[in-house]
C-alpha cells in the first residue's frame, strides 16, 4: 500500500492475536491521541507559557473538531460535503494529521533559529537535517495530502525570505534538500495511482463544468484562515504564518 503507516500499525497488532476491528480501532485511536497531544503543545506555544493549561486543552479540543465554514445553501449537512468530517473518512488521513502539526512546528522552529542566530550559525546541523527529512518522508508515507498543501505554501514563504536574505542561501538549500525524500515518495505514489497499469489506480480527469464548484468548495474550507491572514498582517510568528498559509493552500 502506498500509504503504509496506518496499515503497518494494524498489521503489527494483528500479530498479537487481536481481531482486525479491534486492531484498526486501537491504531486509529492512537493517531487521534497523538494528534490531540500535538495540537495541545501547539496551542501552548501559540498562547504563551503564561496561559493556563486548560485553555490550551480547550483550544486543542476545538481544533480536533473544526471543519469548514457551514453555509446552509451550499453544505447543509455535517456528515456530507466538502471539507466536512464523516463516519467513512479515511483512517490514513487520521494518521497524517499528527505529522502535519509536527512538520509545521519543526519548520517554524528551524526558521526562527535561523533568524535568531543568523546565516552563519543558523544553518541546520546534520542531525537536524536528517530528522527533518525523515519527518517529512514519514508524513508522505502516512498520506501525501498534507504535503500537497504545505510544500507549495512553504516554498512561497521561503522564496520570499531567500530573496530578502540571499546571504542565507546555504540554509535554504538545506531545506530544499530535506524535502527531496518526501518528494520522491510522493512521485512514486503519483506513479502508482495515475500512471502504473494496475486495477487499483485512480483515473485523473479534468472537467471545466465542475471548476466553479471546486473553487467554491475550496473557498469554504479556506474562509477562516483567509480571514486570519487578512486581518492580522503584522503577525511575525513564523509558526502562525506557516500554519495559515498551509490552511489557505
Question: Where would I find each of the regions flagged by the language model?
Answer:
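Transmembrane helix irregularities
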Residues: 16, 65-66, 138-145
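Membrane-interfacial, low-structure loops and terminal tails that flank and connect transmembrane helices
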Residues: 47-50, 111-131, 165-171, 240
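Membrane-interface alpha helices of multi-pass inner-membrane proteins
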Residues: 128-144, 155
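Membrane-interface micro-motifs in multi-pass membrane enzymes
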Residues: 53-111, 211-218
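Transmembrane catalytic cores of multi-pass membrane glycosyltransferases
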Residues: 3, 144-150, 158-249
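Transmembrane-helix motifs of polytopic, lipid-linked glycan transferases
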Residues: 26-50, 102
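Short hydrophobic/aromatic helix or loop-helix immediately within or flanking a transmembrane segment
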Residues: 1-19
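Hydrophobic core segments of transmembrane alpha-helices in multi-pass, intramembrane catalytic enzymes
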Residues: 32, 93-104, 149, 153, ...
Amino acid at each position: 500500500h502506498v500509504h503504509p503507516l496506518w496499515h503497518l500499525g494494524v498489521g503489527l497488532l494483528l500479530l498479537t492475536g487481536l481481531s482486525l476491528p479491534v486492531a484498526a480501532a486501537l491504531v486509529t485511536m492512537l493517531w487521534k491521541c497523538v494528534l490531540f497531544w500535538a495540537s495541545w503543545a501547539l496551542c501552548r506555544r501559540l498562547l504563551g507559557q503564561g496561559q493556563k493549561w486548560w485553555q490550551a486543552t480547550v483550544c486543542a479540543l476545538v481544533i480536533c473538531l473544526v471543519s469548514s465554514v457551514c453555509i446552509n445553501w451550499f453544505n447543509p449537512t455535517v456528515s456530507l460535503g466538502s471539507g466536512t468530517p464523516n463516519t467513512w473518512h479515511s483512517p490514513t488521513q487520521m494518521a497524517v494529521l499528527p505529522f502535519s502539526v509536527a512538520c509545521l512546528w519543526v519548520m517554524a522552529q528551524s526558521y526562527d533559529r535561523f533568524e535568531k542566530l543568523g546565516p552563519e550559525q543558523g544553518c541546520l546541523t546534520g542531525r537536524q537535517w536528517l530528522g527533518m527529512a525523515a519527518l517529512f518522508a514519514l508524513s508522505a508515507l502516512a498520506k501525501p495530502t498534507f504535503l500537497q498543501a504545505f510544500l507549495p505554501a512553504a516554498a512561497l514563504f521561503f522564496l520570499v525570505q531567500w530573496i530578502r536574505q540571499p546571504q542565507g542561501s546555504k540554509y535554504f538549500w538545506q531545506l530544499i534538500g530535506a524535502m527531496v525524500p518526501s518528494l520522491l515518495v510522493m512521485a512514486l505514489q503519483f506513479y502508482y495511482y495515475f500512471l502504473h497499469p494496475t486495477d487499483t489506480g485512480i483515473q485523473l480527469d479534468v472537467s471545466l463544468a465542475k471548476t466553479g464548484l471546486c473553487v467554491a468548495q475550496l473557498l469554504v474550507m479556506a474562509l477562516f484562515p483567509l480571514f486570519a491572514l487578512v486581518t492580522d498582517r503584522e503577525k511575525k510568528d513564523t509558526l502562525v504564518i506557516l500554519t495559515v498559509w498551509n490552511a489557505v493552500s
